[in-house]
């Protein structure tokens, strides 16, 4: 298959409430997809179904291969690392969780790739907010994933930190890694995403490249588009 991920007409119900109502989306190699929508719109539930954390009541999820778990990376907002360990020690430990033994050279190369070479021996607790975000992403790369899920990767960062994370994410996509990320920052979405999927009340209300969506809906910006399509939904 040409896609790394195909979610097809997903449905998830909780009693009489339908949290996900026919959501479909795809991620191709090297593609950066933004999943956006109001709080409670069904984004998190959609991702939980895709990742196998919840069983769908309808639809299906198809990956590029059977049992792809060891080639999927997940970065959550909550810092996943051990604060008392150095950046290098965290990376070595998390690689072991995936059954991977990294050499010193491999650890150094991965830290360099994520802009962390100068703080390899610094405890995670002493890293800046931007460095901690980059370390969180580095940990997801320890097992060489082909598909990444990033939860608000630029949230709570200053402009330099957001810039550095965007460069890192683009560099990963350039190697063929497929990336799906969530964000409430429409400016960041416009700068980073190849494609935007907007979920409102459990349904996909828009799906396409940012420039195409603006033209299709006659919006001046992604923020205007978001506000128009989510009116009375938040």
What are these regions, as identified by a protein language model?
Residues 123-127:
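Conserved ABC ATPase signature
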Residues 189-191:
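A short, surface-exposed alpha-helical micro-motif characterized by mixed small hydrophobic
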Residues 55-70:
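Conserved ABC transporter NBD signature motif
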Residues 92, 96, 102-119:
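Conserved ABC ATPase "signature" region
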Residues 207-208:
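ABC ATPase "signature
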Residues 148-151:
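Catalytic Walker B motif of ABC-type/P-loop ATPase nucleotide-binding domains
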């Amino acid at each position: 298959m040409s896609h790394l991920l195909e979610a097809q007409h997903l449905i998830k119900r909780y009693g009489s409430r339908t949290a996900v109502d026919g959501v479909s989306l795809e991620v191709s190699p090297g593609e950066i997809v933004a999943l956006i929508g109001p709080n409670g719109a069904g984004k998190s539930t959609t991702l939980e179904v895709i990742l196998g954390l919840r069983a769908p009541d309808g639809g299906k999820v198809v990956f590029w291969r059977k049992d792809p778990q060891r080639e999927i990376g997940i970065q959550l907002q909550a810092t996943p690392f051990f604060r008392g360990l150095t950046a290098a020690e965290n990376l070595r430990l998390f690689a072991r969780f995936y059954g991977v033994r990294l050499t010193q050279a491999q650890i150094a190369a991965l830290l360099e790739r994520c802009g962390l070479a100068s703080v390899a021996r610094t405890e995670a607790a002493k890293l800046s907010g931007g460095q901690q975000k980059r370390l969180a992403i580095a940990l997801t790369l320890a097992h060489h994933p082909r598909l990444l899920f990033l939860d608000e990767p630029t949230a709570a960062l200053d402009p330099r930190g957001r810039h550095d994370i965007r460069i890192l994410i683009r560099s990963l996509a350039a190697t063929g890694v497929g990336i799906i990320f969530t964000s409430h920052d429409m400016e960041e979405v416009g700068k980073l995403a190849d494609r935007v999927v907007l979920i409102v009340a459990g349904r996909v209300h828009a799906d396409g490249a940012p420039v195409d969506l603006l033209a299709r809906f006659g919006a001046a910006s992604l923020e205007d588009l978001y506000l128009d399509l989510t009116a009375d939904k938040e």
